[in-house]
Curated annotation (Swiss-Prot):
Diphosphate binds at R79. GO terms for biological process: phosphate-containing compound metabolic process. It comes from Zygosaccharomyces bailii. One of its GO terms (cellular component) is cytoplasm. Mg(2+) 2 binds at D121. This is Inorganic pyrophosphatase. Keywords: Cytoplasm, Hydrolase, Magnesium, Metal-binding. InterPro entries: Pyrophosphatase, Pyrophosphatase_sf.
Length: 287
């Protein structure tokens, strides 16, 4: 199954939107792309939002029809993650699992916090840098539970099935064996990355421990079930999420016409980024 992208506007601008297409027709990366690429083999589809070593805070938007990828804003300004020494930008290919939802109406029994109202985040640790809008097939290795401003924010650790090391990685202990330092750096990065913006250090459930593959698969299944309730209109409050889709004919928000309402591609050259985004921040107590 091949997916392509349709870009509108220039990166690093408020006008930028990136729609995902299947067979040339826009689909929702939140709802239309299947979670499983191969359920029997436990291979998942992951939508890449932010390529490794980049700074722009790109995300699947929840409020717009067909959920294009846009750059997040705060007070009308584009958001960029800071460079926290010794890291540059995001340290993984960062993205999300389609057809998952961290329900903000439900408190998780172990984290004691509600879901963050987003699809489940994925940290892809393979050697190849992805691109925004790429649909990767990944195998799950483990999971961390970030507690982000009082909400549970799961971070699944996964690897592209085409990575040379993928055949050797089967569970979370293999990450430390073949990627020594990766889990420690991941924990550090998520703890400190908001500090340069004046926010406190993030906290983790489970004392920052990465849970194993079985635990991760259970969380993915739970959030997939939550998404099913969401897309079928079975939750009392959908929190403003656009549920419009172009393939799920048994859902109340199915709309074949929605694809034709997406503007034609109008890509523009990337807009320049302010030099301040390159600054390195040195965080006391890190590393």
């Amino acid at each position: 199954m091949t997916y392509t992208t349709r870009q509108i506007g220039a990166k690093n601008t408020l006008d930028y939107k990136l729609f995902i297409e299947k067979d040339g027709k826009p689909v929702s990366p939140f709802h239309d792309i299947p979670l499983y690429a191969d359920e029997d083999k436990q291979i998942f589809n992951m939508v890449v939002e932010i390529p490794r070593w980049t700074n722009a805070k790109l995300e699947i938007t929840k409020e717009e029809n067909l959920n294009p990828i846009i750059q997040d804003t705060k007070k009308g300004k584009l958001r960029y993650v800071r460079n926290c020494f010794p890291h540059h930008g995001y340290i993984h290919n960062y993205g999300a699992f389609p057809q998952t939802w961290e329900d903000p109406n439900v408190v998780h029994p172990e984290t004691k916090a509600v879901g963050d109202n987003d699809p489940v985040d994925v940290l892809e640790i393979g050697e190849t840098i992805g691109y925004t809008g790429q649909v990767k097939q990944v195998k799950v290795l483990g999971i961390m539970a970030l507690l982000d401003e009082g909400e549970t924010d799961w971070k699944v650790i996964a690897i592209d099935v085409n990575d040379p090391l993928a055949p050797k990685l089967h569970d979370i202990e293999d990450v430390e064996k073949y990627f020594p330092g990766q889990l420690r750096a991941t924990n550090e990065w998520f703890r400190i990355y908001k500090i340069p913006d004046g926010k406190p250090e993030n906290q983790f459930a489970f004392s920052g421990e990465a849970k194993n593959k079985k635990y991760a698969l259970d969380i993915i299944r739970e959030t997939h079930e939550s998404w099913k309730q969401l897309i079928h209109g079975q939750v009392s409050d959908s929190k403003g999420i656009s549920l419009t889709n172009t393939t799920l004919t048994d859902t109340p928000t199915y709309s074949a016409a929605a694809a034709s309402e997406v503007p034609s591609a109008s890509p523009q050259p990337d807009a320049p980024v302010d030099k301040s985004v390159d600054k390195w921040f040195f965080i006391s107590g890190s590393a």
